[in-house]
Amino acid sequence: MYSIRKQSRNLQRKWNSNITNRYPIKRKYVAGHTRPCVRRRLLYEPVERPFGHNVLCEKQHGDVFNLQQNTSYTSFVTYPSRGPSGDGRSRDYIKLQSMSVSGVIHAKANGNDDPMEVSPVVNGVFVFSLIMDTKPYLPAGVQGLPTFEELFGPYSACYVNLRLLNNQQHRYRVLHSVKRFVSSSGDTKVSQFRFNKRLSTRRYTIWASFHDGDLVNAGGNYRNISKNAILVSYAFVSEHAMSCKPFVQIETSYVG
């Protein structure tokens, strides 16, 4: 006679689980009862444009840039605005690649209106500087950017290597500077300058970020930049009555 061996409890549990998985229990809903609510609305975020390489060209000239002897003017490099149409930047930050700067200087001696009179030769020094502002900030009600004297000290600093004051080195950094010695005897003298400045390298990358509260206020002006703005300092120093009129073009290469 053969005896039937009882199955172990573990084997029974395994057999029951296989049956349950193979033939799932169908739940029936009784009339009067409703199914629980399930949120089926999907949240779609706007698709951001991919990064792209662009070049922004800006020209700086006009009456505000006309310099008399021992005067200066400070402006800034305009960054691209943010827009969904494909122009400008696609994020609230950009990668600064390089800058190409070119320009001419019109220098002229002042105070001689008689063309028959021979004017003595007068000299002056024009200084153009690019300065990185790592933490751009302007207090409420203040419109002017830091002057040459606030950054470098007296105008006599134009004759030597430019060095930021000790109390400004924690925020500013000189990227590049150009000096041109100009002379005039009454007529206008023109001097040219040109240079290229590499900003980001394989080992060191410079990013600029923006506040961008909304797309309406997502410009590239100084007040909207939260990190790494670039100031442009114009200075002209001379011991004679001279005027200097620059015309500068700045091409900023960026990824954003």
Swiss-Prot record:
<dbReference type="GO" id="GO:0051027">
    <property type="term" value="P:DNA transport"/>
</dbReference>
<protein>
    <recommendedName>
        <fullName>Nuclear shuttle protein</fullName>
    </recommendedName>
</protein>
<dbReference type="InterPro" id="IPR000263">
    <property type="entry name" value="GV_A/BR1_coat"/>
</dbReference>
<comment type="function">
    <text>Binds to the genomic viral ssDNA, shuttles it into and out of the cell nucleus. Begomoviruses use 2 proteins to transport their DNA from cell to cell. The nuclear shuttle protein (NSP) shuttles it between nucleus and cytoplasm and the movement protein (MP) probably transports the DNA-NSP complex to the cell periphery and facilitates movement across the cell wall.</text>
</comment>
<dbReference type="GO" id="GO:0046740">
    <property type="term" value="P:transport of virus in host, cell to cell"/>
</dbReference>
<feature type="short sequence motif" description="Nuclear localization signal">
    <location>
        <begin position="81"/>
        <end position="96"/>
    </location>
</feature>
<dbReference type="GO" id="GO:0005198">
    <property type="term" value="F:structural molecule activity"/>
</dbReference>
<dbReference type="GO" id="GO:0043657">
    <property type="term" value="C:host cell"/>
</dbReference>
<feature type="short sequence motif" description="Bipartite nuclear localization signal">
    <location>
        <begin position="18"/>
        <end position="39"/>
    </location>
</feature>
<keyword id="KW-0472">Membrane</keyword>
<dbReference type="Pfam" id="PF00844">
    <property type="entry name" value="Gemini_coat"/>
</dbReference>
<keyword id="KW-0813">Transport</keyword>
<keyword id="KW-1043">Host membrane</keyword>
<dbReference type="GO" id="GO:0003697">
    <property type="term" value="F:single-stranded DNA binding"/>
</dbReference>
<comment type="subunit">
    <text>Binds to single-stranded and double-stranded viral DNA. Interacts with the host nuclear shuttle interacting (NSI) protein. This interaction may allow NSP to recruit NSI monomers to the viral genome and thus regulate nuclear export of viral genome by NSP.</text>
</comment>
<keyword id="KW-1035">Host cytoplasm</keyword>
<keyword id="KW-1032">Host cell membrane</keyword>
<keyword id="KW-0916">Viral movement protein</keyword>
<dbReference type="GO" id="GO:0016020">
    <property type="term" value="C:membrane"/>
</dbReference>
<dbReference type="GO" id="GO:0042025">
    <property type="term" value="C:host cell nucleus"/>
</dbReference>
<dbReference type="InterPro" id="IPR001530">
    <property type="entry name" value="Gemini_BR1"/>
</dbReference>
<comment type="similarity">
    <text>Belongs to the begomovirus nuclear shuttle protein family.</text>
</comment>
<dbReference type="GO" id="GO:0020002">
    <property type="term" value="C:host cell plasma membrane"/>
</dbReference>
<keyword id="KW-0945">Host-virus interaction</keyword>
<dbReference type="InterPro" id="IPR029053">
    <property type="entry name" value="Viral_coat"/>
</dbReference>
<dbReference type="GO" id="GO:0019028">
    <property type="term" value="C:viral capsid"/>
</dbReference>
<keyword id="KW-1048">Host nucleus</keyword>
<dbReference type="GO" id="GO:0030430">
    <property type="term" value="C:host cell cytoplasm"/>
</dbReference>
<keyword id="KW-0238">DNA-binding</keyword>
<feature type="region of interest" description="Interaction with Arabidopsis thaliana NSI protein">
    <location>
        <begin position="150"/>
        <end position="187"/>
    </location>
</feature>
